[in-house]
Amino acid sequence: MANDYTALGSAIYSLLSGAATVSIYNQRAPQGGTPPYGIFNRQSAIDERTFNTAGISSDYVLKAVSNRVWPGEAKEVYQGLHSIMQDGALSVSGFVLLRNQRGSTFEYQDADGFWHVGGLYRIEIEES
């Protein structure tokens, strides 16, 4: 499963950036980036093996970030991102997508006043 996490991250970026109305970043936005924007990152992952196949079960965070006083903008942007991501057809070279679904959501305001609204997505792929 060489380079499988890189391929999965690239597939998520391609899916989101191809349809989103805001900038999309992996891990974190660049300093000075203009909100609102979307950020995704791998939270955790495990390798799964059966008798003759291998795959990955991973959890990815997807969130919208806004610098508005209230969370409305972040909620609206996240709803758009969620509609793209939920059951989105990720194309991962050498793998078959088994599942791409949200399991939970979150909302908070950080110490700098930025709103973070998002969800945790379970993505499962297996070698083709």
Task: Map each language-model feature to its residues.
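Charged, amphipathic alpha-helical segments and their flanking helix caps
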Residues: M1-I24, R28-P30, Q43-S128
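A short, hydrophobic beta-strand-centered structural micro-motif
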Residues: T34-S44
